[in-house]
Amino acid sequence: MLKKIIGIGVSAMLALSLAACGSENDENASAAEQVNKTIIGIDPGSGIMSLTDKAMKDYDLNDWTLISASSAAMTATLKKSYDRKKPIIITGWTPHWMFSRYKLKYLDDPKQSYGSAEEIHTITRKGFSKEQPNAAKLLSQFKWTQDEMGEIMIKVEEGEKPAKVAAEYVNKHKDQIAEWTKGVQKVKGDKINLAYVAWDSEIASTNVIGKVLEDLGYEVTLTQVEAGPMWTAIATGSADASLSAWLPNTHKAYAAKYKGKYDDIGTSMTGVKMGLVVPQYMKNVNSIEDLKK
């Protein structure tokens, strides 16, 4: 029977994960034995956790335990294990700063439990593009790469303020900003409310676009919420736009729930990925199927 441990803190997760690593990095032990059949996850309501539930069923990992807490707890646990070269399996996704900080690898997913590659979309409330075509033009033209986003994520993870790092990025990448703002006019105090999910990637993108909008004369409000409330805010019109829609897999349920109540005005990033992730020093596991051995 698949087991879940929900809503624990950083200290508790560290204790659980380190206890799970009873075999340490014994290459003769199976991956299941090395991690005591435990996967370290993130927030229980997130899309990647739902997909991980599906993957565990698809691959008959019914006697495994999926631990859920915050993404901060997950990365703290990863750091603790990585520094000690302990085996660990986590739920992971790119873009994320941990792939720049650590040598990690995705486990192959031959059954496609996590679906095909994701994209990050920009969505708006209904009517926004007609009411604010200038801002909508900027948002629809916003596109960047994982490496570019990574410039911001890694600095924020190191303790710098998102707004400060975003301003530095905008000042450094003037040609790119010129592409995003092509045909966009300056305004005087027009208001815009951007809702975003508190993921490192969305903190980066929302702060950058927030800075660009401010430089164009907009009065910008950034509202941090969970994924569900973000979609609700767009659907009900309490927020104007969000750069945080991960489709077609992560936010599939929300997109279906609010179909017809929002507009998708562009894709800011392609090639986004999620799945089960391990350190590269775990040589004996390369596929989710290996976890059954």
Curated annotation (Swiss-Prot):
Q: Which residues form the signal peptide?
A: 1-20
Q: Do you know which InterPro entries this protein is assigned to?
A: ABC_Gly_betaine_transp_sub-bd
Q: State the compartments where it is located.
A: Cell membrane; Membrane raft
A Gene Ontology annotation in the biological process aspect, one of them, is: amino acid transport
Q: Which domain of life is it from?
A: Bacteria
Q: Which UniProt keywords apply?
A: Amino-acid transport, Cell membrane, Lipoprotein, Membrane, Palmitate, Signal, Transport
Gene Ontology CC, one term: membrane raft
Under Pfam families, the record lists: OpuAC (PF04069)
Q: Which cysteines are joined by disulfide bonds?
A: none
**Record carries keyword Cell membrane:** yes
The primary location reported for this protein is membrane
| Record lipid sites (N-palmitoyl cysteine) | C21
In alphabetical order, the GO MF annotations are: transmembrane transporter activity
Quaternary structure and partners? The complex is composed of two ATP-binding proteins (OpuAA), two transmembrane proteins (OpuAB) and a solute-binding protein (OpuAC). Interacts with FloT.
- Cited function: Involved in a multicomponent binding-protein-dependent transport system for glycine betaine.
Protein's UniProt name? Glycine betaine-binding protein OpuAC
Question: Which gene name belongs to this protein?
Answer: opuAC
